[in-house]
Amino acid sequence: MKLKILAAVLYLLISPTVLKAQSKIPPIDIYTLDGERVNATTINNDSMPMILVFFKTYDNDCRKNLFSISEAHENFLAERNIKVVAICVDATGKTDHIKPFVLGNDLDVEVFIDKNGDLKRRMGIPDSPYTIIYDQDMNVYCQYNGYCSGIEEMICQKAVECLNKILK
């Protein structure tokens, strides 16, 4: 019985979420690590799949999710031109801890800061970590809420599946 409950919980954590985030990235201002304001709609991957990861620097599951996807990008996704973009959503007020976090952990992804949580709210992101895979037209291909060990393999598999649809 316990095994069935555990399996159900794991399935809910790693299966594409029933909650649907907004399909397109809305025109909300976000910030680079250097504090420059950019419009979120400028985030794209030149007609290739892209992975968007929402994270908080202080949350253990967010960090594990971000680190594993960053490593997958470095070892596998980058050579397939699949871009990974991370959006930090724990910056209500101060942001000076985010750049040292990114540089100190040698993250191989582009990172932006959602200072007031406007992008997260507008996209309907329920909580972090939250991962969205976009297709070549920046439509949501699939999305995942939460983290569990090995999720990066499933995300890589879905991203490559999306890429293969483009290449056909």
Roles of regions detected by a PLM:
Residues 26, 50, 128-130:
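Short loop/turn microsegments at loop-to-beta-strand junctions
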Residues 19-42:
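N-terminal "domain-start" segment that seeds a small globular fold
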Residues 133-168:
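Thiol-/selenol-based redox modules, centered on thioredoxin-like
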Residues 40-63, 69:
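Short active-site neighborhood of thiol/selenol oxidoreductases, capturing the structured segment around
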Residues 101-134:
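Short, internal strand/loop/helix patches
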Residues 1-24:
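Bacterial Sec-dependent N-terminal signal peptides
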Residues 63-104, 116-121:
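Structural microenvironment flanking redox-active thiols in thiol-disulfide oxidoreductases
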